[in-house]
């Protein structure tokens, strides 16, 4: 078995060896070695008789090998093994065999289905060829419509023949290989032809026979006017007979197309239009039958009226246009032929005793005598659609058996069409609103449950708001399950398309490599939050890290190291929360217990975000060590609310310490100046003591001044000590705990090792 593949842009051919081929190749190789060795030895040892001996020996070996080859070929023919390949091998095969699931062939099959629909719709046009010519008082054939109809039928038959030719070159799946997967394709042309000839060839051959064209062309190229009657009857029987193989072939074709392509019409509106087209086609066929049978009943009325004429045979002959007797007015009774049409066989005449039944509307309206095809076609189409839709309830039939059977067929056909076609069309249209109906059912169940559990009104409003917001965002589609059911490679590409640009908007992931971003995108899950929803509360375990895509959130903490501490921040698009989980995931020494949240996060508006769960984040952090980098650490610190709060408090405390040192420096300078002034006063008093005579009054004033200075110095020292004690206590209260972070140095060392 030969197999060809494209390698580096070139087609390479390989050979698959069977057991029989292996035996033949081994024997041939061994023989070849013997021949080479024998020829080599005998050529060296002898030049004469040895050559003749070796030649006869090699001839015997060749005959032996040939007989074994013939036996192998005979076994392969008798075993009946069918050559089968996989569809991938057929694409590079040199044989002109088509894969049944190839896109080009699927397009051909769709076009062939359309051609079958057109063929079924063109065939009823033959029923419009007979016409009652009131101007000539005869029944004739519309020649222009006959040429147009036969041309359309021939074009469709040519396309049908092309389809039949393709059937001989279209592979099929071997039934024995359908155990698993698509199976193997049979590419043997003989097997393909045998399968087609035994299954659908006879049906296709009968359906494509140009019998209506032959009947019409025979009439158009004939010279006898009496050919109108046999042509009319032949068309009626031929079209009805050929409808059977055409419908029989159409049903398996559509089922085969559904197996290979999945569905003929993928969209809901396309499927509804497809079944509506079939309903209109059934109405068209019914209207064409009604027109043809109306002409037949008019013909029956005229033939019955001719029975009372002097020469009934001649009367019947002149009823059809083109008869030679129509031009001779030698007999008196021929002049009374118009009375047959106007009086005896007119649906409007009171003298007519013929009951047309359901065909009276066609005769009285003049449709059977109209030469305008479009108006005639529309009227008959409306009649068929009206009676199929009402199941023939408005039909007033006569006692004629054919008319009664036709009315019964209309009622049964209308019932079947309403059950099948209209039911399928309704199914397609309902698929457009199936999600909306599911949402209504879920909302009703939710309302019943809330009423049963007596939930307060505020909780009910929150539940309704969340359901409404989720419906508006997802339209009832479970996106996560849809994506998870796809293959891993396709799932990764879809996640990358949906999440990559959004993830890159998060500063923490802006500068990471593609592999890490793919791993993060693959594990992100969409989350929706309504207004006033608490995403996480302070002190609760953090089980996911949230990356905001749209909306605004409030982040609040009261853990500031002192009572009454309160810090509030706003989160917007591009921010994240749950950063304690990232610190926990990056720490190789972290336990299984999840970290506690240091902040309370509340949604201020409707929020769309992507969530990364704890285990997924732990896996990404453990698999990709590039996450442990200084740049990530600095970005994380800059955008983390916990680190921002600690940094703000740290800067605030440093600023206060700076202010206290500055105030202390100013106070120290003031005290030094006061001491210098006090020393100057003492020095002045000591120097002036011997020169001035002290009186009691001067001694008293000096001692009073000295006491005042000592008292002010004592008060200043006491106030300074109190301020120092307050400063130390406030310093200890404002000393916030630094947020925990992993040892990046150890991780970097591990990476280097």
Curated annotation (Swiss-Prot):
Regions crossing the membrane: 112-132, 146-166, 200-220, 234-254, 275-295, 403-423
Residues reported to bind a nucleoside 3',5'-cyclic phosphate: 508-638
Predominant location category: membrane
Residue ranges, Cytoplasmic side: 1-111, 167-199, 255-274, 424-753
Domain IQ: 644-673
A GO cellular-component term linked to this record: plasma membrane
Domain of life: Eukaryota
Database matches in SMART domains: cNMP
A GO term, aspect molecular function: cAMP binding
Matches recorded under Gene3D superfamilies: 1.10.287.70, Helix hairpin bin, Jelly Rolls
Pfam families: cNMP_binding, Ion_trans
Region annotation Calmodulin-binding: where it falls in the sequence: 624-639
Regions of this protein lying in the Extracellular compartment: 133-145, 221-233, 296-402
InterPro entries reported in the protein's UniProt record: cNMP-bd_dom, cNMP-bd_dom_sf, Ion_trans_dom, RmlC-like_jellyroll
Record membrane topology: Multi-pass membrane protein
Keyword set includes Repeat: no
Chain residue ranges for the region called Disordered: 731-753
Keyword flag Transmembrane helix: yes
Location relative to the cell: Cell membrane
Keywords: Calmodulin-binding, cAMP, cAMP-binding, Cell membrane, cGMP, cGMP-binding, Ion channel, Ion transport, Ligand-gated ion channel, Membrane, Nucleotide-binding, Transmembrane, Transmembrane helix, Transport
Stated family: Belongs to the cyclic nucleotide-gated cation channel (TC 1.A.1.5) family.
Record remark on domains: The binding of calmodulin to the C-terminus might interfere with cyclic nucleotide binding and thus channel activation.
Subunit structure as annotated in this protein's UniProt entry: Homotetramer or heterotetramer.
Function (record text): Putative cyclic nucleotide-gated ion channel.
The protein's name: Putative cyclic nucleotide-gated ion channel 8
Species of provenance: Arabidopsis thaliana (Mouse-ear cress)
Gene: CNGC8
């Amino acid at each position: 078995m030969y197999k060809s593949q494209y390698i580096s842009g070139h087609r390479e051919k390989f050979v698959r060896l069977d057991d029989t081929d292996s035996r033949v190749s081994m024997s041939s190789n061994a023989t070849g070695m013997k021949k080479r060795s024998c020829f080599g030895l005998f050529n060296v040892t002898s030049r004469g008789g040895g050559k003749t001996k070796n030649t006869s020996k090699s001839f015997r070996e060749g005959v032996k090998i040939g007989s074994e080859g013939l036996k192998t070929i005979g076994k392969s023919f008798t075993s009946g093994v069918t050559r089968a390949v996989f569809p991938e091998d057929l694409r590079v095969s040199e044989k002109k065999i088509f894969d049944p699931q190839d896109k080009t062939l699927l397009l051909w099959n769709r076009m062939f289905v359309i051609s079958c629909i057109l063929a079924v719709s063109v065939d009823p046009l033959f029923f419009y060829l007979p016409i009652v010519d009131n101007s000539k008082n005869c029944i004739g054939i519309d020649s222009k419509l006959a040429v147009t109809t036969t041309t359309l039928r021939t074009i469709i038959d040519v396309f049908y023949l092309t389809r039949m030719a393709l059937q001989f070159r279209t592979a099929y799946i071997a039934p024995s290989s359908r155990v698993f997967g698509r199976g193997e394709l049979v590419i043997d042309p003989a097997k393909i032809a045998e399968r087609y000839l035994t299954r659908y060839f006879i049906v296709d051959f009968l359906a494509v026979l140009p019998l209506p064209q032959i009947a019409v062309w025979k009439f158009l190229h004939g010279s006898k006017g009496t050919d109108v009657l046999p042509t009319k009857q032949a068309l009626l029987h031929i079209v009805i007979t050929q409808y059977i193989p055409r419908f029989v072939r159409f049903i398996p074709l559509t089922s085969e197309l559904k197996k290979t392509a999945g569905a003929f019409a993928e969209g809901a509106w396309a499927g509804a239009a497809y079944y509506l087209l079939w309903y209109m086609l059934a109405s068209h066929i019914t209207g064409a039958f009604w027109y043809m049978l109306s002409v037949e009943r008019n013909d029956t009325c005229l033939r019955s009226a001719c029975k009372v004429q002097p020469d009934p045979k001649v009367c019947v002959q002149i009823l059809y246009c083109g008869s030679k007797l129509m031009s001779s007015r030698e007999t008196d009774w021929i002049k009374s032929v118009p009375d047959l049409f106007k009086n005896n066989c007119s649906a409007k005449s009171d003298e007519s005793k013929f009951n047309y039944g359901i065909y009276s509307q066609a005769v009285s309206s003049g449709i059977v005598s109209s030469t305008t095809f479009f108006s005639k076609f529309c009227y008959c189409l409306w009649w068929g659609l009206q009676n199929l839709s009402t199941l023939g309830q408005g039909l007033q039939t006569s006692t004629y058996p054919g008319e009664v059977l036709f009315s019964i067929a209309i009622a049964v056909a209308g019932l079947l069409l309403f059950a099948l076609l209209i039911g399928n069309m309704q199914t397609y249209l309902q698929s457009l609103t199936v999600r909306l109906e599911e949402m209504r059912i879920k909302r009703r169940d939710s309302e019943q449950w809330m009423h049963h559990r007596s939930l307060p009104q505020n909780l009910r409003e929150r539940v309704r708001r969340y359901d409404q917001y989720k419906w508006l965002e997802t339209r009832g589609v479970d996106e996560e399950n849809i994506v998870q059911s796809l293959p891993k490679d396709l799932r990764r590409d879809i996640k990358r398309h949906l999440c990559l640009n959004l993830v890159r908007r998060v500063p923490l992931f802006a500068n990471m490599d593609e592999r890490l971003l793919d791993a993060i995108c693959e594990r992100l899950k969409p989350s929706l939050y309504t207004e006033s929803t608490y995403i996480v509360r302070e002190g609760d375990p953090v089980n996911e890290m949230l990356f905001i895509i749209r909306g605004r959130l409030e982040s609040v903490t009261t853990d500031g190291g002192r009572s009454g501490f309160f810090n509030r921040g706003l989160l917007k698009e591009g921010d994240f929360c749950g950063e304690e989980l990232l610190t926990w995931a990056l720490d190789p020494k972290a336990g299984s217990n999840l970290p506690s949240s240091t902040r309370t996060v509340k949604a201020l508006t409707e929020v769309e975000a992507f969530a990364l769960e704890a285990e997924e984040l732990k896996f990404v952090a453990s698999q990709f060590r590039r996450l442990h980098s200084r740049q990530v650490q600095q970005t994380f610190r800059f955008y983390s609310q916990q680190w921002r709060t600690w940094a703000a408090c740290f800067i605030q405390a440093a600023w206060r310490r700076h202010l206290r040192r500055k105030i202390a420096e100013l106070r120290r300078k003031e005290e030094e100046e006061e001491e210098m002034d006090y020393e100057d006063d003492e020095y002045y008093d000591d120097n002036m003591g011997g020169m001035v005579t002290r009186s009691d009054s001067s001694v008293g004033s000096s001692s009073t001044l000295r006491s005042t200075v000592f008292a002010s110095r004592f008060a200043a020292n006491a106030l300074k000590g109190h301020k120092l004690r307050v400063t130390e206590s406030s310093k200890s209260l404002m000393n916030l705990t630094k947020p925990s972070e992993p040892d990046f140095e150890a991780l970097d060392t591990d990476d280097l090792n």
